[in-house]
């Protein structure tokens, strides 16, 4: 599977869990009262940032921790209603 495809697939799952909650981590974190849910997601992004920094410094689990950070970054984008194409368009804009 191409890298863009897997990101789109993960994004779609996150959107589905936001719109049709099931008993999952992502559904639960997004279904709290609005401010509390946002705070929880942002706390996870901050936590994962720290873990990426430590992993890079210690040369341990950098890929694993980076995927956690990317996942939680995608989660806040979905929560905020950002469309996946906006992200790819911004990457394309910066490429030139």
From Swiss-Prot:
Reaction catalysed by this enzyme: 1-(5-phospho-beta-D-ribosyl)-ATP + H2O = 1-(5-phospho-beta-D-ribosyl)-5'-AMP + diphosphate + H(+)
Enzyme Commission number(s) from the entry: 3.6.1.31
GO molecular function annotation: ATP binding; phosphoribosyl-ATP diphosphatase activity
Keyword list, A-Z: Amino-acid biosynthesis, ATP-binding, Cytoplasm, Histidine biosynthesis, Hydrolase, Nucleotide-binding
Major subcellular site: cytoplasm
GO biological process: L-histidine biosynthetic process
Cellular component terms (Gene Ontology): cytoplasm
Superkingdom per UniProt: Archaea
Top class in the EC scheme: hydrolase
Gene3D superfamilies listed in its UniProt record: MazG-like
Pathway in which this enzyme or protein is active: Amino-acid biosynthesis; L-histidine biosynthesis; L-histidine from 5-phospho-alpha-D-ribose 1-diphosphate: step 2/9
Compartments where found: Cytoplasm
Ribonucleoprotein listed as a keyword: no
Family named by the database record: Belongs to the PRA-PH family.
PANTHER family in UniProt: HISTIDINE BIOSYNTHESIS BIFUNCTIONAL PROTEIN (PTHR42945), HISTIDINE BIOSYNTHESIS BIFUNCTIONAL PROTEIN HIS7 (PTHR42945:SF1)
Protein name as annotated: Phosphoribosyl-ATP pyrophosphatase
Provenance organism: Methanobrevibacter smithii (strain ATCC 35061 / DSM 861 / OCM 144 / PS)
